[in-house]
């Protein structure tokens, strides 16, 4: 599969062949589903909780006598049918985490890359090594690539680059992605995936080998 290659300024240079080990593996929708499901589940805190009648403060005294008042008998003001009472079958704290094997995630990443390449949504750019923070310069790069108003851009760079990360985070449609910590959500939920040459080589080392 082919992809467009851009200069550091965002100018189109040529069309290159993408590594087949990364972008031509067999598409597995099931693997993508399981990996995304696990990542979404792991983002949930699970700290929601309601109080039952035994946990709500107060209500120890019987509201009124059992007989002779004309009211229905009541044992506590914290019964579920009272205002301020406990909750029946309400949500309780739980662990939503869902684990998948590294082999499945590996397969999911390659499947997503394949899907992106088929949709011509993968762009390769020369390595960027800024020496200062500049949102304006990165905004200009994406404008030159004609990607600025096309939707979310996944910007995949090698390692943790503080200058790059802080420069692009003020651009609402750009998602910074560290090649050392790739998540399926990051590379899937975007309209275009822009990859630096160094990040592409690192991905080839990490995901290119058959598992």
Curated annotation (Swiss-Prot):
Keywords: Ribonucleoprotein, Ribosomal protein, RNA-binding, rRNA-binding. GO terms for cellular component: ribonucleoprotein complex; ribosome. Residues 44-94 are annotated as: Disordered. InterPro entries: Ribosomal_uL4, Ribosomal_uL4-like, Ribosomal_uL4_dom_sf. Coiled coil: none annotated. Part of the 50S ribosomal subunit. HAMAP family: Ribosomal_uL4_B. One of the primary rRNA binding proteins, this protein initially binds near the 5'-end of the 23S rRNA. It is important during the early stages of 50S assembly. It makes multiple contacts with different domains of the 23S rRNA in the assembled 50S subunit and ribosome. This is Large ribosomal subunit protein uL4.
């Amino acid at each position: 599969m082919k992809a467009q290659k851009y200069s550091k300024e965002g100018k189109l240079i040529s069309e290159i062949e993408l590594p087949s080990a990364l972008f031509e593996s067999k598409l597995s929708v099931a693997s993508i589903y399981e990996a995304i499901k696990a990542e979404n589940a792991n983002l949930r805190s699970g700290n929601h909780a309601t109080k039952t009648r035994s946990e709500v403060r107060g209500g120890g005294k019987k509201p009124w006598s059992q007989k002779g008042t004309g009211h229905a008998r009541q044992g506590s003001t914290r019964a579920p049918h009272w205002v301020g009472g406990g909750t029946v079958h309400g949500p309780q704290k739980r662990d939503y985490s869902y684990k998948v094997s590294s082999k499945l995630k590996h397969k999911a990443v390659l499947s997503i890359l394949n899907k992106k390449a088929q949709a011509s949504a993968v762009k390769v750019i020369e390595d960027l090594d800024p020496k200062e923070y500049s949102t304006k310069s990165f905004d200009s790069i994406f404008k030159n690539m004609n990607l600025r108003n096309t939707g979310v851009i996944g910007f995949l760079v090698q390692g943790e680059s503080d200058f790059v990360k802080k420069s692009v985070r003020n651009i609402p449609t750009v998602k910074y992605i560290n090649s050392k910590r790739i998540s399926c959500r990051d590379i899937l939920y975007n309209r275009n995936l822009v990859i630096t040459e160094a990040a592409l080589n690192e991905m080839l080392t990490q995901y290119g080998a058959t598992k």
